[in-house]
């Protein structure tokens, strides 16, 4: 048995992108007995599992065990089920309903998708309030009491019938209700985490054999699980983040701890100049599946580009000038540049590309005539650049303004066309990036640690890949390049974009590697890691 603890919660917008879920899907497809374990309150768990595309995957939630919830499915509470008391007037505002009595707010209902009840807050005359949080199976899962200052006074977890099981006080101490005492080892706990660990341990002990447990490095429960449950586990496996490591995983307390990285680049970045330890492994959570996109059309010259980070200012400027010159030299190329708006390096690179455009063409994007032209183009989607210029000539003449010279008209049109072929996407969603790759000809990731999921999608789509960080899927010079220097990008790109023979060779290699990185081969790697069959 494998227990997987995903790292998404009630607020996660895209649980389908969770690494633990990706691994669970591989296990499910290969009949590995697996269960998702959730160690935190999760009133909308069924909703999130549906979003994650695993609605019927076996799961266990510790709070169901705590609250004695005997069923997995149910019908959510909806707005029409909320009673309307006499003398109370409701007001709707998209996902919120406010109820007033004689001008005083007495109840607030917060909704999901305009009709599913998430919580109801009741207000008394003194400003104190009680909030009932609803499970998406239709019952109140916990109740919170707050004073007029908004401070939590106590919180109770309830059975589906509405009986309190546990009550947490303002000092975090948790008291077990007498009626439920026999299900717990203590009448009082220091905090709710102690109860959670007790119930997870009990659940593990009901299994026929010690399970392997897979957790994500940045899961807030990681230390608690390893501190308290290590003796109950056959093996603990940590899915390491690609970047932004929150802790030193090597210091985690477990004798049989394994670290799994999504790529060689991620592992190398984590260990730096040190030799990777024997308990560190590279297994992609994303299987490759052959699904060729539009990239096999020679006319399609879309390049999906992840801009670089960690470059010196001089190198950033040089790279930007290189990208600009490539686009200026080949009017068929289109670059979709994905940047993290919080990365100064990537934002700077974007700005330097624009500066290089203006320097080459001789006009800035802040030029008054250019801005008028661009805004007119946006309003006239079906018109050509020449048509819009003719229109502006007429408008300028009517307004007795100095006409735009032929030379400047050419500069404006050239600047506009370049801007249309260098499309900057600020912090695009993973879904958006995966969609772009399916329509691209080459995938370029200039970041120090490339994204494993994007790499797997590029392989599945048949694209050549060009990266700076190590790439498990690249056979150097055949289906891609791992660059020693980002400045080598122009030669690497033209190798695939300007020579159909090279592009076809890359496609053949990608098809071969899709089999190599299939679900079957991934599960073989996982089984080897967990010592199955020994």
Describe these PLM feature segments.
Residues 1-83:
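N-terminal subdomain of nucleotide-sugar transferases
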Residues 75-194, 198:
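Repetitive, compositionally biased segments used for assembly/scaffolding
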Residues 253-279:
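A short, active-site helix/loop in glycosyltransferases that binds the activated sugar's phosphate group
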Residues 288-404:
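Conserved catalytic-core segment of nucleotide-activated headgroup transferases in glycan assembly
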Residues 419-429:
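Active-site donor-binding acidic/aromatic loop of nucleotide-activated sugar
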Residues 429-440:
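Short acidic alpha-helix that forms the nucleotide-activated donor recognition element
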Residues 501-531:
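A charged, aromatic-enriched C-terminal amphipathic alpha-helix characteristic of glycosyltransferases
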């Amino acid at each position: 048995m494998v227990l997987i603890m995903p790292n998404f919660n009630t607020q996660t917008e895209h649980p389908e992108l969770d690494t633990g879920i990706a691994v669970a899907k591989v296990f499910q497809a290969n009949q590995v007995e697996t269960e998702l374990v959730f160690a935190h309150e999760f009133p909308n768990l069924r909703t999130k599992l549906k979003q994650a595309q695993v609605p019927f995957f076996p799961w266990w939630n510790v709070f169901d065990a705590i609250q004695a919830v005997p069923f997995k499915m149910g019908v959510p509470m909806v707005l029409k089920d909320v009673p309307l008391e006499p003398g109370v007037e409701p007001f709707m505002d998209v996902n919120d309903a406010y109820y007033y009595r004689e001008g005083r707010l007495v109840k607030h209902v917060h909704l999901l998708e305009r009709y599913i009840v998430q919580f109801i807050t009741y207000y008394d005359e003194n400003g104190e309030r009680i909030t009932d949080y609803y499970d998406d199976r239709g019952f109140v899962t916990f109740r919170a009491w707050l004073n007029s200052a908004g401070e939590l006074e106590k919180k109770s977890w309830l059975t589906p019938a509405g009986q309190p099981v546990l009550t947490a006080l303002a000092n975090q101490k948790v008291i077990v209700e007498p009626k439920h005492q026999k299900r717990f080892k203590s009448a009082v706990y220091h905090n709710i985490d102690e109860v959670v660990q007790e119930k997870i341990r009990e659940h593990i002990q009901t299994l026929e054999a010690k399970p392997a447990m897979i957790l994500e490095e940045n899961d807030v429960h990681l230390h608690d699980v390893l501190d308290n449950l290590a003796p109950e586990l056959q093996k603990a496996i940590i899915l390491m983040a690609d970047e932004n490591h929150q802790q030193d995983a090597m210091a985690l307390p477990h004798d049989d701890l394994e670290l799994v990285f999504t790529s060689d680049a991620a592992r190398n970045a984590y260990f730096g100049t040190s030799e990777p330890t024997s308990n560190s492994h590279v297994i992609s959570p994303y299987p490759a599946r052959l699904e060729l996109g539009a990239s096999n059309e020679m006319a399609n010259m879309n390049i999906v580009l992840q801009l670089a980070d960690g470059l010196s200012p001089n190198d950033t400027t040089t790279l930007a000038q290189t990208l600009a010159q490539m686009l200026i030299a080949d009017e068929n190329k289109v670059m979709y540049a994905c940047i993290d708006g919080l990365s100064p390096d990537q934002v700077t690179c974007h700005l330097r590309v624009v500066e290089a455009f203006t320097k080459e063409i001789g006009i800035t994007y802040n030029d008054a005539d250019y801005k008028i032209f661009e805004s007119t183009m946006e309003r006239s989607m079906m018109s050509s650049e020449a048509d819009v210029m003719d229109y502006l000539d007429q408008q300028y003449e009517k307004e007795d303004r100095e006409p735009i010279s032929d030379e400047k008209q050419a500069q404006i049109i050239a600047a506009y066309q370049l801007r249309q072929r260098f499309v900057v996407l600020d912090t695009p969603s993973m879904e958006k990036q995966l969609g772009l790759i399916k329509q691209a000809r080459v995938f370029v990731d200039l970041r120090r640690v490339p994204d494993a999921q994007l790499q797997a999608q590029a392989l599945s789509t048949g694209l050549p890949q060009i990266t700076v960080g190590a790439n498990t899927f690249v056979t150097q010079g055949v289906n891609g390049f791992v660059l020693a220097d980002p400045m080598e990008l122009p030669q690497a790109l033209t190798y695939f974009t300007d020579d159909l023979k090279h592009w076809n060779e890359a496609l053949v290699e990608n098809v071969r590697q899709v089999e190599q990185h299939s679900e079957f081969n991934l599960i073989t790697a996982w089984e080897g890691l967990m010592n199955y069959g020994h």
